[in-house]
A protein has these predicted regions:
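Bacterial N-terminal signal peptides that target proteins for export
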Residues: 1-7
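Bacterial N-terminal signal peptides
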Residues: 7-16
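Boundary at the C-terminal end of the N-terminal hydrophobic targeting segment
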Residues: 18-23
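Extracellular attachment/recognition segments
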Residues: 24-226
Length: 226
């Protein structure tokens, strides 16, 4: 049975209010590191999840985030193991967890960052000396990214593989750019989600205000073998 450890901070993780001169720290202390920046993900009082992946043959070695508001709490999902290390606690992708815990900012958002290191630098889990079940990976995440088009309506249906069942589903709205999206921009994208017969149906509506910007919706499915 796989257990997930939600860590609000791990060595290089530091969430700060976004500022034009802020240099993120996802690669701090790492000799070989490829930085990867995600979009500005809209935050709300309900938890939002967003997955950011490393290039092939790399694993997550550091994390950071920019915040448009200090009222946003950001953490990530890590796996159990010892020592807490790239390749053990983290894998080739990181799932960020964001929530607006203070204030009523309708345009609150966070921008996830990961620092990627060569996969060979990660450790391995040490076998235990007894025969109890160690934390495993009974579920898999299926992530889809849908481009949002201005002034239109788009429907998208996501599902797990044929030999899997759907456990949970979440979606997130993101805007790529160096600065957080404005309130008028965030109000221009609306997403509704329905689950029926193991399928997740998204209805995405976008106004003309997003023309000239790059907006996406990420659908995150948690699937398990039947």
């Amino acid at each position: 049975m796989r257990r997930l450890l939600i860590l609000s901070a791990l060595a290089t993780v530091c969430a700060v209010a976004a500022a034009p001169a802020y240099a993120t720290n996802e690669c701090r202390g790492l000799q070989v590191c490829v930085p990867v920046a995600g979009p500005w993900v809209l935050a709300s009082p309900g938890e939002v999840q967003f997955q950011l992946a490393c290039p092939k043959r790399f694993v997550v070695g550091g994390l950071d985030a920019e915040l448009s508001s200090r009222g946003i709490d950001v953490g990530f999902v890590g796996s159990l193991g010892s020592p807490v290390n790239p390749g053990i606690t983290t894998s080739k992708a990181a799932v960020f967890l964001g929530r607006l815990v203070r204030g009523r900012d309708s345009a609150a958002s966070f921008r996830p960052h990961i620092g990627c290191v060569p996969a060979s630098g990660g450790g391995q889990r040490t076998p235990t000396a007894y025969h109890a079940f160690a934390p495993g990976k009974p579920s898999v995440r299926r992530v889809s990214q849908i481009t949002v088009r201005p002034g239109g309506l788009r429907r998208y249906v996501g599902r797990c593989a044929a030999n899997e069942k759907l456990v949970a589903a979440t979606h997130a709205i993101g805007f790529f750019g160096d600065a957080p999206p404005s309130a008028s921009l965030t109000r221009s994208v609306h997403v509704t989600q329905r689950i029926a017969a193991g399928r997740v149906k998204l209805t995405i509506r976008a106004g003309r205000a997003i023309a000239g910007s790059r907006a996406i919706v990420q659908l995150d499915l948690l699937c398990a073998p039947r």
